UniProtKB/Swiss-Prot annotation:
Homotetramer. It comes from Cupriavidus necator (strain ATCC 17699 / DSM 428 / KCTC 22496 / NCIMB 10442 / H16 / Stanier 337). The keyword Chaperone does not apply. PANTHER family: GLYCERALDEHYDE-3-PHOSPHATE DEHYDROGENASE 2. Pfam families: Gp_dh_C (PF02800), Gp_dh_N (PF00044). D-glyceraldehyde 3-phosphate binds at residues 154-156, 185, 200, 213-214, 236. The active site is at 155 (nucleophile). InterPro entries: GlycerAld/Erythrose_P_DH, GlycerAld_3-P_DH_AS, GlycerAld_3-P_DH_cat, GlycerAld_3-P_DH_NAD(P)-bd, Glyceraldehyde-3-P_DH_1, NAD(P)-bd_dom_sf. The keyword Cell membrane does not apply. The record marks 182 as: Activates thiol group during catalysis. This is Glyceraldehyde-3-phosphate dehydrogenase, chromosomal. It comes from the Bacteria.
Length: 336
């Protein structure tokens, strides 16, 4: 069954979802039928074709009246502020990828259902009212046919949860603290400007900027047995893409570097293949740009002192997450 997908909001994630679909050789039976964005269609086509972070799109993108042509496929382009007024029913949309960052609760995202869509995936942490928060590869099996609005969590939770799952299963995670060393994003500023968060008011290009994140705590939404056991914060740094999760945790029993690395290597080669990668080379952040994995565990950085464990994982915070949006869309559409 071909799953008809619409993208609402054509920013960093919206564009990368489309690119990932085509650059991945349409590995899923998905048809992107529409894009809704208030921006000029010609500008959005140009930004799809040419990207500072991910390079030139290896295909053709053009504007054809009220549509994009992407490698010959016609994708309807809309510019409607109110999701409830979008023609999702007319277009037969199965899943809307809600990528604006504006409709992040079930109540708000349900406007797409009133427009005729069957399901919605929010490309951000959702409110407590969403039907499920999903990290593909970790808990997508909980999806049910009755789920209509779900969250794809955050890029950081998508990196952290695949690390935590096998470690908790094999060692037991008592509690832990995470720092994400995170590239700057569009919710920061180029030069100092007023912001309620005084640190986020400062230039993203000039400083390391500590700020809050709910990514660690959100693991409890994905793995309820860990609810309340993880916390952390982010340090935004002056790089444009790729981030690093640094997790320190107390294990239920003493362990070793070799055992920890072995657990994650087995997971990367087994149940989490394609979601969790395993790295042993002395690499830096740019080497993981455009990597489709949610998380790349760096075995060279593991430290252990009895029951105290530190592990690290790289992630392309744009590309990996966008690939998981596609995976989750298929899982949601096929949920029974």
């Amino acid at each position: 069954m071909t799953i008809k997908v619409a993208i609402n909001g054509y920013g960093r994630i919206g564009r990368n979802v489309l690119r990932a679909h085509y650059e991945g050789g349409k590995r899923h039976d998905i048809e992107i039928v529409a894009i809704n964005d208030l921006g000029n269609a010609a500008t959005n086509a140009h930004l799809t074709q040419y990207d500072t972070v991910h390079g030139r799109f290896p295909g053709e993108v053009s504007v054809d009246g009220d549509a994009f042509r992407v490698n010959g496929d016609r994708i309807r382009v809309l510019a409607q502020r109110n999701p409830a007024e979008l023609p999702w029913g007319e277009l037969g949309v199965d899943v809307v990828m809600e990528c604006t960052g504006l409709f992040t609760s079930k109540e708000k995202a349900s406007a797409h259902l009133r427009g005729g869509a069957k399901k919605v995936i929010i490309s951000a942490p959702g409110g407590k009212d969403v039907d499920a928060t999903i990290v593909y590869g970790v808990n997508h099996g909980v999806l049910k046919a009755t789920d209509t609005v779900i969250s794809n969590a955050s890029c950081t939770t998508n990196c952290l949860a695949p690390l935590v799952k096998p470690l908790h299963e094999k060692l037991g995670l008592v509690n832990g603290l995470m720092t994400t060393v995170h590239s700057y994003t569009n919710d920061q500023v180029l030069t100092d400007v007023y912001h309620e968060d005084l640190r986020r008011a400062r230039s993203a290009t000039m400083s390391m900027i500590p700020t809050k994140t709910g990514a660690a705590a959100a693991v409890g939404l994905v793995m309820p047995e860990l609810d309340g056991r993880l916390d952390g914060f982010a340090v935004r740094v002056p790089t444009i893409n790729v981030s690093l999760v640094d997790l320190s945790f107390v294990a239920a029993r003493p362990t070793t570097v070799e055992e920890v690395n072995g657990i994650l290597k087995a997971a990367a080669e087994g149940e989490l293949k394609g979601i969790l990668d395993y790295n042993t080379a002395p690499l830096v952040s740019v080497d993981f740009n455009h990597n489709p994995a949610s998380s790349t565990f760096d075995a060279t950085l593991t430290k252990v002192n009895g029951t105290l464990v530190k592990v690290s994982a790289w992630y392309d915070n744009e590309w990996g997450f966008s690939n998981r949006m596609l995976d989750t869309a298929v899982a949601l559409a096929h949920a029974r």
